[in-house]
């Protein structure tokens, strides 16, 4: 069986943490900030962790990522 290839689009969007988790960026940060409060914008700047329910699927896509 051939090696699994890394899903390159996913590899660019996620970073692995030291404990094996995955960091991601928040959605809704591209444009139209006038409708969001300062607090919302500040919190959206910080990275978030991938939820446990999505971990298995995403880890398979980025299996070769280090």
UniProtKB/Swiss-Prot annotation:
Pfam families: Ribosomal_L35p
Region (Disordered), start-end ranges: 1-52
HAMAP family linked: Ribosomal_bL35
The UniProt record lists the keyword Membrane: no
Assigned protein family: Belongs to the bacterial ribosomal protein bL35 family.
Species of origin: Lactobacillus acidophilus (strain ATCC 700396 / NCK56 / N2 / NCFM)
Name of the protein in its database record: Large ribosomal subunit protein bL35
GO molecular function: structural constituent of ribosome
Keywords: Ribonucleoprotein, Ribosomal protein
Gene Ontology BP terms: translation
InterPro entries, per the entry: Ribosomal_bL35, Ribosomal_bL35-like, Ribosomal_bL35_CS, Ribosomal_bL35_sf
Record-level GO cellular component terms: cytosolic large ribosomal subunit
Amino acid composition bias (Basic residues), ranges on this chain: 1-46
């Amino acid at each position: 069986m051939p090696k699994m290839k890394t899903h390159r689009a996913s590899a660019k969007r996620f970073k692995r943490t030291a404990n094996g988790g995955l960091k991601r960026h928040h959605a809704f940060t591209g444009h139209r900030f006038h409708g969001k409060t300062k607090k919302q914008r500040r919190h959206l700047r910080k990275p978030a962790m991938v939820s446990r329910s999505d971990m298995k699927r995403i880890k398979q896509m980025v299996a070769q990522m280090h």
